[in-house]
């Protein structure tokens, strides 16, 4: 039994210590202590989420989706780590449980939890439609950092980064290799769970695309809230597990050779 599973809750004496509900077309932030678990859960209907994570004491150290993709592939699941940006390059969190791991890859090459889509944003929407829309995931995440963390708008927007698309069903087309989205298979009760390997600040947007099977970056799609729950575990089961360490590279870059 894996530590992150529901079946393991009693064995490892886990206790829920916090909970955040993310409203549709909005974002919320949350804190996770090193050694705790956090779970992103569908609670009312099919809904995808765009996840940013930061090292809680240094928001310049943030999730690096490109490096995570290079190490694991286009989609991630149980056992895969979410690596941080240069010059830190360490695991921020590890996925410990995934109720959608049964989906695998479909005949079109689609799968869930991708690290290939960047996030919906108002700039691309303006470019392609010449309209303004303020509730794309990029804006939602920026707004949450400004409102809940008292970060200036320009600073917040600069640290919002390419996301883990939680529950999102995506891939590349077989013929043109273009990015595609399909309706997510997620249903209420499904969740993706993580183990925090350092103190984390998370930010999660409930995407305006809903299950991302139709309209995107608008108010057309039916959207639902997402739940983030934080879990503590009896520390005797974590003996020998230490915080992840930042890269030991000396950052000389050949200048003293």
Task: Identify the function of each model-found stretch.
Residues 1-8, 12:
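Single conserved hydrophobic/aromatic residue that forms the stacking wall/gate
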Residues 23-27, 33-35, 187-189:
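Solvent-exposed, conformationally flexible loop/turn segments
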Residues 28-45, 49-51:
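Beta-strand cores of secreted/periplasmic/IMS beta-sandwich domains, seen most often
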Residues 32-40, 192-209:
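Noncatalytic modules at the cell exterior or secretory-pathway interfaces
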Residues 45-47, 61, 117-121, 131, ...:
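Extracytoplasmic/secretory-pathway segments with low complexity and glycosylation-like composition
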Residues 49-62:
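Short Gly/aromatic-enriched secondary-structure transition segments
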Residues 69-170:
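Low-complexity, serine/threonine/proline-enriched polar segments
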Residues 200-257:
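Long, compositionally biased interface segments
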